[in-house]
Amino acid sequence: MISILVSRFLLAALVLQYATIDAVNYCNLPCRGDRFHVGCGESAFAQECGESPETLDLLKEHTDEILSKINDVRDHVAKGSWGLPMAARMKVVVWDEELARLATRHTKGCLAETHACRNTERFLFPGQLNFEYTDDKLPQTKELIDAAIKKGHLQKHNISREIIESYKDNGPDGDVEELALALSDRVTAVGCGLTTWQDGAKARALLTCNFSSQNIWERPVYKIGNSPGEKCIEKDETYKNLCSASEPIDSNESN
């Protein structure tokens, strides 16, 4: 019965996502300063995209790969691995089509860093990670995804309890931004996009993932517990140290 209810919840959420995407006028959403919204205006490739730019569809096998890798590391850390504290209420991350569409729009600029805002009506402070790839030729999409995830996973050597308790994007041993964002207990959803293009003799790609929330400087990455998921209403059946996908966590609240 529980699994049926969870399935219905996820289906309803997916229907709501598509309805939201079609209804929102991103040009009307507030942006700080003089920045523009990435979802506003025509969805065209930027001049920086060189020759033959193409946005690649992420298939179910790709989105499943992204979600499984993120949830694997969340589940691993939630139980206190890598010398990090246990997480009291970290939930399973799900795919979000609106975040994915905005991530795709971002990749069509062919620049990892832009000043465009990406907030939505549901997610006021979304986080973002970018992975750039340059080589003589591009690998398969799955290999690009795996390379991006590996880059973030290697930051386990840099992250510490002190960073979990009071976030900074760099530890004594290096950058932790990618891994720390994947571990935020306010992150409930993710959506990614991928664009490739030719830059002279080099093939290039930009993979962007938008997260439903972002870490706040000197605030906890996640709430610490005495046992994994001790504050969960219900644990996930697969990722047993995480809350289920139906856990009512507000991505817009801060720790």
Curated annotation (Swiss-Prot):
Signal peptide range in chain numbering: 1-23
Any single GO CC term annotated in Swiss-Prot or TrEMBL for this entry: extracellular region
Keyword vocabulary terms for this entry: Cell adhesion impairing toxin, Hemostasis impairing toxin, Platelet aggregation inhibiting toxin, Secreted, Signal, Toxin
Record's keyword annotation contains Cell inner membrane: no
The record ties this protein, via Gene3D superfamilies, to: CAP
Compartments in which it is found = Secreted
> Which InterPro entries does this UniProt record tie to the protein?
CAP_dom, CAP_sf, P14a_insect
User: Where does this chain mainly localize?
Assistant: secreted
Superkingdom to which the source organism belongs? Eukaryota
S-S bridge residues: none
| Ranges of residues in domain SCP | 67-211
What tissue expression does the UniProt record report for this protein?
Expressed in salivary glands.
Q: Where are the annotated coiled coils located?
A: none
Q: Where is this motif: Cell attachment site?
A: 32-34
One Gene Ontology term of the molecular function aspect = toxin activity
Name the family the entry cites. Belongs to the CRISP family.
Q: What is its biological role?
A: Inhibits platelet aggregation induced by all agonists tested (ADP, arachidonic acid, the thromboxane A2 analog U46619, thrombin, and snake venom snaclecs (TMVA that activates platelet through GPIB, and stejnulxin that specifically acts through GPVI (GP6))). May act by competing with fibrinogen for binding to glycoprotein IIb/IIIa (ITGA2B/ITGB3).
Query: What is the protein name given in its UniProt record?
Result: Tabinhibitin 2
